[in-house]
Amino acid sequence: MDNVTIDRLSPGVHTIDVNGTAQRYHVHGTGPVCLAMPGGPGVDWEYLRMPAVERRLTVVYVEPIGTGGSGRLASHPNGYTRERYTRALIALLDHLALPKAYLLGHSHGGFVVQHCALRHPDRVAGVVLYESAPLTGPEHVAEAIANVQEFTRRNADNPELPEVVNAFQATATISNDEEFGTVLRGLLPSYFADYWGRAEEFAPLRASVRGSHISSLDEHLVPEIIDDRAALAALAAPALVIVGRYDVICGVRWARELDTLIPSSQLLVLENSGHFGHIEEPDVFADAVADFVAPQSK
């Protein structure tokens, strides 16, 4: 790497301008570079910190436009399409003077990374699709409902279960950042394989997680429905697909479909995780990601 790239990858927070919108990113760790796109859309990036990964990789955490200290579009909370996020990712790669890079996307961030890899194969060295799926829409929602029903059966006797169920019911009426954060914190136990069995460990995340309300509409108020199934056969970059056995949102069914559809793919099922394997099984997760991005860094 040249001196410009080294400076722009120095530890800490950085800000660039992407077509008039501030785009922040945060650099942590040491080793080969991997950009990390968080989920939501709208969840503040800090939940995705991966200290075990940072021991072997330089992780560039993207703070997506519309969230945290990054700028907001004039059309906020609308207009945050995968194409918009992809343009910001490519602008960041240009700023870092990286001809190619590995991209990790968690949940909705996985949707963005898939899109970026399909649109810009020359800029993507490989992708980590972490709790992603090949599609959204009615089929995805139906699968999530079935998974949530299974979660409620497993936890039927837990006195805190009604709070989680109420949070799921409130998702359809979110209209501002405060409501988004409240619902997110209410949902969080369902995103772990065994939240209540490890509540002391996970409670600080639940208390601190924040975000910004971002709709699923483009700037013309048209819903962005994703279906990458036909396109994924053309995804040229190697892929690592990671899923938690107990993920209720982007579960094993979708991970297996991604693994089948992408020509050069490998699948890791984290048997003791839900949606947050980097927190629930950090060492297994980190070894898989680092071995994929930089096997020589062992």
Feature locations, PLM:
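Active-site loop/oxyanion-hole signature of alpha/beta-hydrolase fold enzymes
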Residues: 61-104, 108, 287
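Catalytic active-site module of serine/aspartate enzymes centered on a nucleophile-bearing elbow/loop
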Residues: 265-298
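Alpha/beta-hydrolase
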Residues: 148, 158-230, 237
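Conserved HGGG/HGGXW glycine-rich cap/lid loop of the alpha/beta-hydrolase fold
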Residues: 15-78, 92
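Short beta-strand/loop motif that positions the catalytic acidic residue
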Residues: 235, 241-243
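Acidic catalytic loop of the alpha/beta-hydrolase fold
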Residues: 246-250
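Conserved hydrolase catalytic core segment
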Residues: 99-143
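Flexible "cap/lid" loop of the alpha/beta hydrolase fold
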Residues: 127-170
